[in-house]
UniProtKB/Swiss-Prot annotation:
This is CinA-like protein. It comes from Thermosynechococcus vestitus (strain NIES-2133 / IAM M-273 / BP-1). InterPro entries: CinA, CinA-like_C, CinA_C, CinA_KH, Competence-induced_CinA, MoaB/Mog-like_dom_sf, MoaB/Mog_dom. Belongs to the CinA family. It comes from the Bacteria. HAMAP family: CinA_B (MF_00226_B).
Length: 416
């Protein structure tokens, strides 16, 4: 038995508001173990709404509607559903009384508000404690259940939790859970990741699906089980296989971030880090200090755009700076060592590069970045990165910051 989410509203089609209701409902259905394979957005047009309903009835047994329950002429969900299933509408006295009470505190009840008291004959009221528009629970024919909710997210969510979920569970929905775990990777393209774990992706249970987001690759492992504990038992061996195959390119799972992983590693070792930034404008320091308790591991940073600051504050050799240029492996290494020494930290990390749009040459294009890491043992490494400048300055700065975090993470793991 599968569900389908149908969101009604021309404003959604025009992109005027974000369709967060569909995201919430999809997550809720997964947590209840109710499969759903389709989501539809349709405008405030009765003909098109009916076409959507006709298609949905052929492929789902639970239809969940949001939007179109208000008092205005373009709020058409209830009457369109009643018309589609050839069921008359009736005014519910209890809804009308509730509307009159609520509107008394909102400037008075008007005749147009009466339409919100109409439901198809046989439908059950789905109360709305926060707003004026009630929803309904309706089974217009055997084997089909319809739930309707207002489009206001806060109202919909409370109605879902308080009334819809208990109803669905009482009807035998939600006997299983659909549980997912997302593994996160940095430093490996999605296509290469998919090739390396092709055997795991080919399995049907658990399913493994690759995707990319904000420069990182991810694998979503999904399983259906009787409860979360069983789901985790099924996922664990698959996750272990993937981690063994991929190695250090897998940096975490679910809500982990590169900055959070670095922070945890530093705190476990009781070590500190300082940063020197030339093209990221403090972005690396911001990421490291976004987390609570960052003063335990973050000493501070130097934003050194001018060459004289690189020399006077970070100890970069002026002759080498002149010869190699500010954007070079040698300068990145000296910046990392300089900030580590100057701020008396265990680790030093530096970024120097050309974020664009200006400052580039044929030899040093936009997107050329060097990242340096000074280790506690005195060793200093630097790495060259060439990012595409076509996505703009902010993208180069973002990738520079993320790769600096990743390079530090890898060094923390291989230099315990």
């Amino acid at each position: 038995m599968s569900a389908e989410i149908i969101c009604v509203g021309t404003e959604l089609l025009l992109g005027e508001i974000l369709n967060s209701n569909a995201q919430f409902l999809a997550q809720q259905l997964a947590s209840l173990g109710i499969p759903h394979y389709y989501q539809t957005v349709v405008g405030d047009n009765p003909t098109r709404i009916k076409k959507v309903v006709a298609i949905a009835c052929d492929r789902a047994r639970l239809l969940i509607f949001t939007g179109g329950l208000g008092p205005t002429p373009d709020d058409l969900t209830t009457e369109t559903l009643a018309d589609f299933f050839a069921t008359p509408l009736e005014e519910r006295p209890e809804i009308l009384a509730d509307l009159e009470r609520k509107y008394a505190h909102r400037g008075g009840f008007s005749p147009s508000n009466r339409k919100q008291a109409l439901l198809p004959v046989g439908a059950q009221i789905l109360p709305n404690p926060l707003g004026t528009a009630p929803g309904m629970i309706w089974q217009p024919r055997t084997g089909l259940t319809i739930l309707t909710f207002p489009g206001v997210p806060a109202e919909m969510k409370q109605m879902w939790h308080e009334t819809a979920v208990p109803f669905l569970c009482s009807q035998g929905w939600g006997k299983e859970v659909i549980y997912s775990r997302v593994l996160r990777f940095w430093g490996i393209p999605e296509s290469m990741l998919a090739e390396k774990v092709a055997a795991q992706i080919a399995r049907e249970h658990p399913t493994v699906a690759p995707y990319a987001s904000n420069g990182e690759a991810r694998l979503r492992i999904t399983v259906r089980a009787k409860d979360e504990a069983e789901a985790q038992q099924l996922i664990q061996p698959v996750e272990a296989e993937i981690r063994q195959i991929i190695g250090l390119d897998c940096y975490g799972a679910d809500e982990d971030t590169l900055a959070g992983v670095v922070a945890r590693l530093l705190q476990e070792r009781q070590q500190t880090v300082a940063v020197a930034e030339s093209c990221t404008g403090g972005g690396l320091g911001e990421m490291l200090t976004r987390l609570p308790g960052s003063s335990l591991y973050f000493k501070g940073g130097v934003i050194a755009y001018a060459n004289e600051i690189k020399v006077t504050l970070l100890g970069v050799n002026p002759e080498e700076l002149e010869r190699e240029g500010a954007v070079s492996a040698a300068v990145a290494a000296q910046m990392a060592l300089g900030v580590k020494t100057r701020l008396a930290s265990d680790w030093g990390v530096s970024i120097t590069g050309i974020a664009g749009p200006g400052g580039a040459t044929l030899r040093k294009p936009v997107g050329l970045v060097y990242i340096g890491v000074a280790l506690p043992n005195g060793e200093v490494i630097s790495r060259e990165f060439r990012f595409s400048g076509q996505r703009g300055r902010d993208w180069v700065r973002y990738l520079s910051t993320m790769n600096a975090l990743d390079l530090l993470r890898r060094q923390l793991l291989v230099n315990p």
